């Protein structure tokens, strides 16, 4: 499959799941979506979500999953990560939450805040009745940065109930707008 933008063709492939690694931090030992990922590239991910009604849902959104075994710094306020990842639903950009960890000195003795999506309230998103477009821009520079030692080129996106307790019933995820 391919995607054409401004007269140039780009290769595509399907990925199934709520969390996708484009490149795993352990490199070739744990394969990601890209067979031979290279630094200084940008990937794009999209899907359509069919909603049987207009509704407010929660979403788990994440572009870097943190662990305290590393001395990684939390993202800067107003940014999802240090890679400049971005996400839009129905052409409206979804901004990151206010990060509770704001330290700028590396230490693995500082507890994680709400950096990981499952440790915070889901991000509210409005779905229209019918098809809703989800689009993500996923740039990556180097796979090791001063802020984050093990850069995780990945994304998580899934709709959940506003309280985050379960999946939203009746939704269909389809990059081809197919009700299956």
Q: Where do the model's predicted regions map?
A:
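Extracellular and analogous surface-interaction loops
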Residues: 45-58, 123-129
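Beta-strand-rich ligand-recognition modules
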Residues: 73, 78-155
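Beta-strand elements of well-folded, non-transmembrane domains
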Residues: 47-53, 63-67, 140-142, 161
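A short beta-strand element within beta-rich, extracytoplasmic domains
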Residues: 53-77
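Short, solvent-exposed loop/turn motifs
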Residues: 93-94, 165-167
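Short, solvent-exposed aromatic-acidic interface loops
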Residues: 65, 100-103, 174-179
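Activation corresponds to long, low-complexity, non-globular regions
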Residues: 1-13, 166-180
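Extended carbohydrate-recognition surfaces in non-catalytic/accessory domains of CAZymes
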Residues: 1-53
């Amino acid at each position: 499959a391919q995607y054409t933008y401004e007269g140039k063709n780009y290769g595509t492939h399907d990925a199934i799941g709520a969390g996708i690694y484009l490149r795993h931090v352990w490199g070739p030992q744990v394969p990601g979506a890209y067979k031979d990922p290279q630094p200084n590239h940008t990937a794009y991910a999209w899907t359509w979500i069919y909603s049987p009604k207009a509704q407010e849902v929660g979403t788990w959104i994440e572009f870097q999953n943190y662990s305290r075994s590393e001395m990684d710094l939390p993202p800067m306020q107003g940014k999802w990560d240090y890679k400049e990842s971005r996400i839009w639903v129905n052409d409206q950009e979804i901004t990151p939450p206010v990060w509770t960890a704001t330290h700028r000195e590396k230490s693995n003795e500082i507890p994680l805040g709400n950096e990981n999506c499952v440790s915070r309230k889901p991000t509210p998103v409005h779905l229209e009745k019918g098809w809703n477009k989800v689009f993500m821009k996923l740039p990556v520079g180097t796979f090791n940065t001063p802020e984050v030692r093990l850069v995780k080129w990945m994304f998580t996106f899934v709709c959940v109930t506003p309280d985050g307790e379960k999946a939203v019933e009746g939704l269909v995820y389809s990059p081809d707008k197919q009700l299956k």
